[in-house]
UniProtKB/Swiss-Prot annotation:
Binding site for Zn(2+) 2: C97, C100, C103, C111
Record carries keyword Transmembrane helix: no
Source species of the chain: Uromyces fabae (Rust fungus)
Enzyme kind, highest EC tier: oxidoreductase
Protein name: D-arabinitol dehydrogenase 1
MF (Gene Ontology): D-arabinitol dehydrogenase (NADP+) activity; zinc ion binding
Domain of life: Eukaryota
């Protein structure tokens, strides 16, 4: 086992229970023969972390959160062959059992014992974090800030797999968060001849234009966008082949089906409050043969996400708008809640 001198303890963000977190000294994780220990350089913060803070999603407590982890390997088990000490890596945080009903049917995303570092297992809001070596991927050309976007990019790749857009598709993407902006770019790269991005006017849409995320942009009025939605329908009387709802807002997901073309697809892509409900007409779904598809997390999409970002085909310039120290995590949550940011990251030291 390759080694170097390591401290016995580390600084970590620790939740005892929902809404109850503190900065603590925790033991540096011990690794097994097939695992690596990372010195975390940065970890992204996303909407899922807000839901974890509230005790929603699939979170388990107590917990060290953080699921968009970048770091350098400082310790490797003696069975590790794919990476080595000194490699900068990003981490696929999903863990599956390989033996349940769904895993054996080749659909491990639905694993009955599904776990995720930073959600149900300890993650990257700490100075050190451990992962199975099979779940880490070296990066070369990405800054730490850019690398925080690999995990959400992998979710966008999975979303693309679920949509399977036909060449020449017309697509409407609602919401301009990080993973939505990357999915918009993936649609452009994979068959869509027209991508329309609709989101609230402000910083996110400004960045969307800078990275050329879409073909057309609709800057929605935050207070009253009713006329703009009506105009969108008038301008597109037959709707869109693909509609992606990426806001996580209950009222918008309810309305999004009204922009789907007959025979088209609605991708439910946002992270919603557990209490959110939809009231779609089954007759409309039946008569218009609308495909309603969910896209949750990802499995086996990291290599493609790394390749897209390393090549520059997916642009991420300026998407990380705020970086905080781990001790400033409450400020990070407050900034995210204010909607005055696009992507936030945390540095452990």
């Amino acid at each position: 086992m390759a080694t170097q001198t390591l401290p016995a303890q580390m600084t970590a963000l620790y939740y005892e229970k929902p809404r109850d977190f503190s900065i603590i000294k925790a033991d540096v994780p011990l690794i097994d023969h097939d695992e690596v220990l990372l010195k975390v350089s940065m970890c992204g913060v996303c909407g899922t972390d807000q839901h974890i803070h509230e005790g929603e999603f699939i979170a388990k407590f107590p917990l060290i959160p953080g699921h968009e982890v970048i770091g350098t390997i400082v310790l490797a088990g003696n069975q590790v062959e794919n990476v080595k000490v000194g490699d900068r890596v990003v981490c696929d945080v999903s863990e599956t059992c390989h033996k349940c009903f769904f895993c054996q049917r080749g659909t491990p995303l639905f694993c009955e014992s599904f776990e995720a570092h930073g959600v149900t297992l300890n993650g990257g809001f700490a100075e050190y974090a451990k992962f199975r070596a099979a779940k880490v991927f070296p990066i070369k050309n990405l800054t730490d800030e850019q690398a925080t976007l690999v995990e959400p990019a992998s979710c966008a790749v999975h979303g693309l797999d679920k949509i399977r857009p036909k060449p020449g598709s017309e697509c409407l993407l609602i919401g301009a968060g990080p993973t939505g902006l990357m999915l918009a770019q993936l649609l452009k790269l994979n068959g869509a001849q027209r991508v329309v991005l609709a989101a609230n006017k402000g910083m996110k849409m400004d960045i969307a234009r800078k990275i050329n995320a879409a073909d057309e942009y609709i800057d929605l009025d935050r207070k009253d966008a009713a006329n703009q939605w009506a105009q969108l329908k008038e301008d597109n009387p037959h709707g869109f082949d693909v509609v992606v709802e990426a806001t996580g807002v209950e009222s918008i997901v309810n309305d999004s089906i009204n922009y789907v073309r007959r025979g088209g697809t609605l991708l439910v892509y946002g992270v919603y409050d557990n209490a959110a409900r939809v009231t779609w007409s089954p007759t409309k779904i039946f008569q218009d043969e609308i495909n309603i598809v969910g896209s949750f997390a990802q499995i086996h999409c990291f290599p493609r996400a790394v390749a897209y970002l390393e090549s520059g085909k997916i642009r991420t310039d300026g998407m990380v708008t705020h970086v905080y120290k781990i001790e400033e995590y409450q400020e990070a949550l407050d900034k995210m809640a204010s909607r005055q940011c696009l992507k936030i990251a945390v540095k452990p030291n």
